[in-house]
């Protein structure tokens, strides 16, 4: 079964081909980061227009990489939500029209489910069940995953997501867009212990997160040093911020592992690429004897490969596809609303 995946939820356009037996055959990706950097963040209208420009060339690239013809595709999976409404509509309309043209069904996919399942693209994938830490610019959640579409929410952020806190704190430190990754690199140059920042909800007793207070603490720190914003200060502040957020993510994840009794942890989403987070979790995994899995770095950001994979696994788990032509997107779409509906 050959699945074509289309991703367009924000500022990356991705097209991929996934075979149920051979695995990932190709994936083509275009990032709009350079375009949005001029504005200091994603401009939704510009994102939508650029998706329109990129989808057809990327489709040709993906087909060429895989050595496949369009009529060999068995179904077209696409991101239905959550995300930017206009950006989602571009990918949705493209996928539905393409499927209609080749008389194949479509599979609407949840963007976060794509991230959640992306470690299954690796050569050493996790097996169900496992605990998942989803950390991105828009979401921070801990879940118990027992199968495709079988998700139990253990805890989530009550305000800002971890990735959002990274980006906003980077902006406070005067770093250009996209700031989160730059803050992480800057933190490597910082000295531990120079600044102390709060660990929000670290001892709350539950698995909820809150990062708005940490962002406010960075703002206060910056204001206190407004007359001495040296490179050294920025590096030390970045180090303090990253250590605080990583400690919270790690300790909450360990608590979820203990609470569920599971021995596998999946970390997915853009923040999952953070070096300090990975190093700390790997050390804890060795110490507490559990396994931790991450997507390949190229699949931490938004991509079509994870959408193609999720679509394929959805079909294999019994979720029905639908006839092409009619469609809708869901900019706001809680992952817990997803469920497997076995075909009769």
Curated annotation (Swiss-Prot):
<feature type="binding site">
    <location>
        <position position="180"/>
    </location>
    <ligand>
        <name>substrate</name>
    </ligand>
</feature>
<dbReference type="GO" id="GO:0061711">
    <property type="term" value="F:N(6)-L-threonylcarbamoyladenine synthase activity"/>
</dbReference>
<dbReference type="InterPro" id="IPR043129">
    <property type="entry name" value="ATPase_NBD"/>
</dbReference>
<keyword id="KW-0819">tRNA processing</keyword>
<dbReference type="InterPro" id="IPR022450">
    <property type="entry name" value="TsaD"/>
</dbReference>
<dbReference type="GO" id="GO:0002949">
    <property type="term" value="P:tRNA threonylcarbamoyladenosine modification"/>
</dbReference>
<feature type="binding site">
    <location>
        <position position="111"/>
    </location>
    <ligand>
        <name>Fe cation</name>
    </ligand>
</feature>
<feature type="binding site">
    <location>
        <begin position="134"/>
        <end position="138"/>
    </location>
    <ligand>
        <name>substrate</name>
    </ligand>
</feature>
<keyword id="KW-0808">Transferase</keyword>
<feature type="binding site">
    <location>
        <position position="167"/>
    </location>
    <ligand>
        <name>substrate</name>
    </ligand>
</feature>
<protein>
    <recommendedName>
        <fullName>tRNA N6-adenosine threonylcarbamoyltransferase</fullName>
        <ecNumber>2.3.1.234</ecNumber>
    </recommendedName>
</protein>
<dbReference type="Pfam" id="PF00814">
    <property type="entry name" value="TsaD"/>
</dbReference>
<comment type="similarity">
    <text>Belongs to the KAE1 / TsaD family.</text>
</comment>
<feature type="binding site">
    <location>
        <position position="115"/>
    </location>
    <ligand>
        <name>Fe cation</name>
    </ligand>
</feature>
<keyword id="KW-0012">Acyltransferase</keyword>
<dbReference type="GO" id="GO:0005737">
    <property type="term" value="C:cytoplasm"/>
</dbReference>
<comment type="function">
    <text>Required for the formation of a threonylcarbamoyl group on adenosine at position 37 (t(6)A37) in tRNAs that read codons beginning with adenine. Is involved in the transfer of the threonylcarbamoyl moiety of threonylcarbamoyl-AMP (TC-AMP) to the N6 group of A37, together with TsaE and TsaB. TsaD likely plays a direct catalytic role in this reaction.</text>
</comment>
<keyword id="KW-0408">Iron</keyword>
<feature type="binding site">
    <location>
        <position position="274"/>
    </location>
    <ligand>
        <name>substrate</name>
    </ligand>
</feature>
<keyword id="KW-0479">Metal-binding</keyword>
<keyword id="KW-0963">Cytoplasm</keyword>
<dbReference type="InterPro" id="IPR017861">
    <property type="entry name" value="KAE1/TsaD"/>
</dbReference>
<dbReference type="InterPro" id="IPR000905">
    <property type="entry name" value="Gcp-like_dom"/>
</dbReference>
<dbReference type="GO" id="GO:0005506">
    <property type="term" value="F:iron ion binding"/>
</dbReference>
<feature type="binding site">
    <location>
        <position position="302"/>
    </location>
    <ligand>
        <name>Fe cation</name>
    </ligand>
</feature>
């Amino acid at each position: 079964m050959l699945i074509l995946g289309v991703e367009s939820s924000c500022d990356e356009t991705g097209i991929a081909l996934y075979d149920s037996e051979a695995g990932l055959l190709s994936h083509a990706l275009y990032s709009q980061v350079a375009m949005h950097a001029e504005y200091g963040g994603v401009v939704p209208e510009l994102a939508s227009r650029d998706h329109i420009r990129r989808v057809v060339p990327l489709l040709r690239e993906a087909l060429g990489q895989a050595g496949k013809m369009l009529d060999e595709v068995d179904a077209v999976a696409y991101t239905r939500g959550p995300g930017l409404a206009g950006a989602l509509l571009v990918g949705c309309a493209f996928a539905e029209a393409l499927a209609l043209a080749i008389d194949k069904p479509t599979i609407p996919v949840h963007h976060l489910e794509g991230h959640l399942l992306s470690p299954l693209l690796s050569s050493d994938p996790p097996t169900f069940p496992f605990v998942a830490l989803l950390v991105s610019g828009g979401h921070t959640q801990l879940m118990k995953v027992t199968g495709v579409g079988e998700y139990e929410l253990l805890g989530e952020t009550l305000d800002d997501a971890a990735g959002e806190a990274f980006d906003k704190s980077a902006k406070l430190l005067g770093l250009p867009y996209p700031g989160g990754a730059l803050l992480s690199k800057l933190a490597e140059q910082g000295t531990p212990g120079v600044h102390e920042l709060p660990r929000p909800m670290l001892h709350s007793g539950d698995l909820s997160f809150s990062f708005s207070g940490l962002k406010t603490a960075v703002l206060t720190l910056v204001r206190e040093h407004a007359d001495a914003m040296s490179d050294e200060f920025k590096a030390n502040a970045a180090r303090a911020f990253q250590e605080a957020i990583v400690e919270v993510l790690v300790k909450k994840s360990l608590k979820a592992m203990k609470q569920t009794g599971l021995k596998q942890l999946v970390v997915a989403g853009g923040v999952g690429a953070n070096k300090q987070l990975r190093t700390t979790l790997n050390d804890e995994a060795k110490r507490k004897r559990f396994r931790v899995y991450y997507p390949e770095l190229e699949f931490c950001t938004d991509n079509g490969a994870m959408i193609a994979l999720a679509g394929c696994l959805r079909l294999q788990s019994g979720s029905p596809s639908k006839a092409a032509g009619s469609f809708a997107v869901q900019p706001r779409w809680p992952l817990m609303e997803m469920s497997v509906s076995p075909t009769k």
